[in-house]
Every structure is written in C-alpha cells, then in structure tokens.
Amino acid sequence: MDIRAAEISAILKDQIKNFGKEAEVSEVGQVLSVGDGIARVYGLDNVQAGEMVEFPGGIRGMALNLESDNVGVVIFGSDRDIKEGDTVKRTGAIVDVPVGPELLGRVVDALGNPIDGKGPINATRRSRVDVKAPGIIPRKSVHEPMSTGLKAIDALIPVGRGQRELVIGDRQTGKTAILLDAFLNQKAIHDNGPEGEKLYCVYVAVGQKRSTVAQFVKVLEERGALKYSIIVAATASDPAPMQFLAPFAGCAMGEYFRDNGMHALIGYDDLSKQAVSYRQMSLLLRRPPGREAYPGDVFYLHSRLLERAAKMNDDKGAGSLTALPVIETQGNDVSAFIPTNVISITDGQIFLETDLFYQGIRPAVNVGLSVSRVGSSAQIKAMKQVAGSIKGELAQYREMAAFAQFGSDLDAATQRLLNRGARLTELLKQPQFSPLKTEEQVAVIFAGVNGYLDKLPVASVGKFEQGFLSYLRSEGSAILDAIRTEKAISDDTKGKLTAALDSFAKSFS
C-alpha cells in the first residue's frame, strides 16, 4: 500500500484546522444537600460572594455563604430537579440584570427575564444588581419637586426628586394606590413636557398576589402610563431568593436613568415582604438570628438599597432616583423592628391609617404624624405660598377638635377654626386615579385657605372644587398657565384668581 506523505500532512493540517478551540474550562463543585431553596455545594473554591452559579438544567443560583468546607447557594427557581451529587458550575459573573430604555413598558422577573409574553427584551446593557450607592461628593441636595398629583401629599408632605419617602400603613389602607397615582401623574409631562422633566417609573412588586400585579399593570396600560414604566415582579409563588433580589434588580434599572442625566421614580411594594424572604434565606443558611428572628444585617439590607436613591450633581448629569418604599404594619404598630428601621433610613414618611380610611378620608394620610424631611425645598414657590398656612390650621383644628368634644359653648374664634378645619380636611380628599396638576392644586388650596369654602356646607366642598376646576380650565386657563410658568403667585395672578373665585362662588350658590 502506497502512503503519500503530502496527502497525510494535508489530512493532518485539515484535522488541526477543524480542531475545536472552544474547549470550556470551568470550576465545578458538587451538591452535598439541597432543600428549601438552599443548596450546600462542595468545591467551587474560588467562588465570589454574590456570584451566579449554574445547576444542571440551566437553573441559576447565587453563592451567599462562603464557608471553610462548603458554599451555601440560594436557588433562583425550583429546587425539585436538583439532586445530591449534581455538578454546579461557576459563571464568573456577579448577579446582574439588563437595563436601559428597552425595558420600558415591560414586566420582568427579578433576573430581568420578560414574563409578559411580549417577546424577548433586546437590551444591550447590563448592570450589577448590588452596587455601591453614590458617595457624598457626586450628590446634590434635593431641590426639585416630584409631584404625586395628590393634594394631601404635594401640599403637606412634599416629595423631591432624589428623596426617599416611606409609605407606611396597615393592609388595605391605600399604600399601593398612592404609588399608582404618583405614576399616573407623570403622564402629562411624558405626553408634552420637556425631556429633562420626564420621570420614568419602576414598580417592584415583592410577594404580592399575581392577580394584584396584573391589575396594577392593567390600570397603567389603560391609562397610558405603561409606556414609561418598568414592572419588576417577584410574586408570592416565587422562591424567597427572587423576592429578596427583586428590589435590587428594580433599583439597578432605575439607576440607569439616574446615571444618564434622567429622572426615575421607584416604588418598592413592599419591603416588609422582602425582609421576611431575607429572614427565611438567612435562617436556612444557618446565619444567627437576631431580634424577631431577623438576621443581624437586615438593617444593612434596606439601607444599602435605599441609599442608592439620590440626586446627582451637575457634573454627574444632574439625574435623580426617587424611592417610595412601602412598609406594611400589623395593627398600626410602627414601633416594630422593620418599620423603625426603614423610618430611620428614609427622608420622611407618609402614615396611612385604617380609621381615616373607613371615615372616608382618602388618601388616608395622617397629616399630624407624616413628615417630609426635605420639606418646602421640594415645592414650587406658589405651593409654599398657599400650603404654608394649611398645615398650621390643620394642626390647630386637630387640637381643638379633641377639646370641642367636651365643651358645647365655644367662642366664635374656636368655632371658626373648627369650621375651617373640617372644610380643609374635606378639601384634601381625592378620588383614586385622578391626580391633579400642581397649578390646579394651588388654585384649589388657595380657595380653601382664603375662606371661600367657609360658608359652604362640608358636603358641598368636593362639588365646589370640581366646579371651580372646570371653570378655571375653560375660563381661566391663563391663570393656570401663569402659575405653571412663573411657579409663584404674583400680585397680578392673585388678583385674577380672587376675581375668578368671586365670580364662580356667586354662580355656585
């Protein structure tokens, strides 16, 4: 048999050319035990804390406990298909999510995978979920209003861009409704406002019923607010690690806007459930429990999340991320562990009370206990001019109302105070899904503090408000425009507003 050397070398060259260069070298470990969403893995000696690892079948996990003889991994998904002895691979990547404008209008899970059936998300950028918050130098103090469209909040407990304002209350007191109204209120700016004013919204649902999240998305869609919103959902049926991760994932998505000179608003609904899922993970990882069986670093869990909401300085693009975390209390107990923690981290809180809710005062904001630590620097001058007196009058009203229950013969001044207070309380009521523009709120509150409601029966206050706003939109749009552009009530505007109120009050009675 005749063997030609040239032929052999050609065959060898061909073989070498087609030799697979994509041999994959990865560090692997073995599952020692698995259960309750936690896997103990032997090996993975060089794994990093917070690194993503991969189980057979493409299930992902995150290395949290790095011990001398094994690694504690939390599993993002079902642990049913993972068995003892399975091989676990390092991915080399810290947990990250897709970010960018491509996510707007979509519903994603805590890892950024779409769950709304609208096809894949073609995001080109990814960001780590757990990054350090901006330091002191890149920040700027909060000075621009973040309008929620709710009179009770924008007038008395103003929220600024870059602030963290806690929404706290028992179940069924309208906490999510406040977030929803704040989202819907951004529609007017998105439709015809300047680019620099637009506020992109991120809603993080933690441990809620799927039906509740679906309802939230439906309302946003019907009212045209989904196009500038991102929904991150880790529902009650998702494993605890997903519920723990969702707020961080949503925050990373919001930070993209903050770091690119845009503005974002993120609502965490709610952080009590995130703390519960973190407690579950920590106890299963055998970390020592502390107060109420929460781990020692549950304060750090929330502080490092909420510190990422910030107003950046001009060198950094002047973007902002505003956070509205929600905490659900049990039986109005705000002195429990998680509520006190989050109250101490945030820049103020909006207290919602069951009693007020059932009295028909909605939004059920307790004006006495709620504060905003940013205060009037997050209001336009026009709002400061009218809302300055309303807070004092309401405080006096609450004090007097307590005394007035005992005495029947009240002097005229007290009677006047009680009358005014009852009407102002009525004025701050607002139906859901009907946020008001700032200039409309200013006009309405102006009527309240200048005595135009004092002669009306309390039941007619709402009707007067609706009528007056319709009148202003048709007849006095120049007044509203003046308040919007000047951001203050000049003497000229004040005269016109008073004249408009006088003429409307005559026709109303």
Curated annotation (Swiss-Prot):
Membrane topology according to the record: Peripheral membrane protein
Positions annotated to bind ATP: G169, D170, R171, Q172, T173, G174, K175, T176
Cellular compartments annotated: Cell inner membrane
Homology family: Belongs to the ATPase alpha/beta chains family.
EC number: 7.1.2.2
Catalytic activity: ATP + H2O + 4 H(+)(in) = ADP + phosphate + 5 H(+)(out)
Single annotated GO MF: ATP binding
Keyword check for S-adenosyl-L-methionine: no
UniProt superkingdom: Bacteria
Function: Produces ATP from ADP in the presence of a proton gradient across the membrane. The alpha chain is a regulatory subunit.
Subunit-structure text: F-type ATPases have 2 components, CF(1) - the catalytic core - and CF(0) - the membrane proton channel. CF(1) has five subunits: alpha(3), beta(3), gamma(1), delta(1), epsilon(1). CF(0) has three main subunits: a(1), b(2) and c(9-12). The alpha and beta chains form an alternating ring which encloses part of the gamma chain. CF(1) is attached to CF(0) by a central stalk formed by the gamma and epsilon chains, while a peripheral stalk is formed by the delta and b chains.
Any single Gene Ontology cellular-component annotation: plasma membrane
PANTHER family: ATP SYNTHASE SUBUNIT ALPHA, MITOCHONDRIAL
UniProt entry keywords in alphabetical sequence: ATP synthesis, ATP-binding, Cell inner membrane, Cell membrane, CF(1), Hydrogen ion transport, Ion transport, Membrane, Nucleotide-binding, Translocase, Transport
Organism: Rhizobium leguminosarum bv. trifolii (strain WSM2304)
Name under which the protein is recorded: ATP synthase subunit alpha
Name of the encoding gene: atpA
Site (Required for activity): S370
